[in-house]
Amino acid sequence: MLMPKRTKFRKQMKGRNRGYATRGASLATGEFALKAVEAGRVNSRQIEAARQALTRHVKRQAKIWIRVFPDKPLTKKPLQTRMGKGKAGVEEWVMNIKPGRIIFEMAGVDEELAREALTLALHKLPFKSKFVTRESENEIY
């Protein structure tokens, strides 16, 4: 699972996930990509499930880049616990995703196979996303 090796602080505040992505919003190395259309939060299990779906469909022919990393700790109190007694322990690691953020990139296969594989991967993610190419990446969400 993806998670930081060490952090300066164990827990973080929730924060807000507003606006559009400015960083990570354009293709860096690949020819095809999966771009977020709406805001959401992705955890390490969802990233791994999508990555496995991608690699199995392309049968390891393509080069795949994961452009997101869950570095925000999410805490959760156990069931049937009364309020108070401090902030709960870290349950999982997540990353806030803004619209326009590139999630996965892919190169080395034709567009049809890449579209099929990335469509399989987008069904594993908890927010709407779309397939983009180098030519179509600058379109409005």
UniProtKB/Swiss-Prot annotation:
Listed GO biological process terms: translation
One GO CC term on file: cytosolic large ribosomal subunit
Question: Mind listing the GO molecular function terms for this protein?
Answer: rRNA binding; structural constituent of ribosome; tRNA binding
The record's listing under Gene3D superfamilies reads: Ribosomal protein L10e/L16
- Which branch of life, at top level? Bacteria
SUPFAM superfamilies named in the record: Ribosomal protein L16p/L10e
Q: Which residues cross the membrane?
A: none
What PROSITE patterns does UniProt report for this protein, alphabetically?
RIBOSOMAL_L16_1
Which keywords are on file for this protein? Ribonucleoprotein, Ribosomal protein, RNA-binding, rRNA-binding, tRNA-binding
Alphabetized InterPro entries for the sequence:
Ribosomal_uL16 (IPR047873), Ribosomal_uL16_bact-type (IPR000114), Ribosomal_uL16_CS (IPR020798), Ribosomal_uL16_dom (IPR016180), Ribosomal_uL16_sf (IPR036920)
Instruction: Kindly give the Pfam families that the UniProt entry links to this protein.
Output: Ribosomal_L16 (PF00252)
Biological role: Binds 23S rRNA and is also seen to make contacts with the A and possibly P site tRNAs.
What family is reported? Belongs to the universal ribosomal protein uL16 family.
Quaternary organization = Part of the 50S ribosomal subunit.
Name assigned to this protein: Large ribosomal subunit protein uL16
Query: From which organism does this entry originate?
Result: Campylobacter concisus (strain 13826)
